[in-house]
Amino acid sequence: MKNKSLLILLFCSSIIFSQQQDKDGIYLNVEKMTGIKGGFGAVAKKIKYPKVAVKMRMQGVVYVGFVVNPEGKVENSKILKSVAEILDEEALRVVEKEIEFEPGYHEGKAVPVRFVLPIKFQLSAAQKAKYQL
């Protein structure tokens, strides 16, 4: 009985881990994952912290989900975890217009890849001092 349970468990786990695409044909796991040109530092440099958000002491991490197509372009971006609408809008602007991505590759071919990018909004000491936070 233990052997049968173990075989069933191994079979099911191999099916789960072998699924590399979702129902839309977007890859979830690839040999070479999509990447941000310039790394995460490039993301931080592109963020323009909204003045209203600074005055209101808004901070947090916005999670943006999207697909990087085989040409490295962003498609179907959406907020997965929100902090505040004004920060969400800035996060989407950065992802859609400011950052360049390297495409993901599977079996030597560029493929569409689902990606989640956390964008951290944290007030600097200068911003806190300016508005006496």
What is the predicted role of each segment?
Residues 4-14:
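Sec-dependent N-terminal signal peptides
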Residues 5-6, 18-133:
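Charge-biased low-complexity segments
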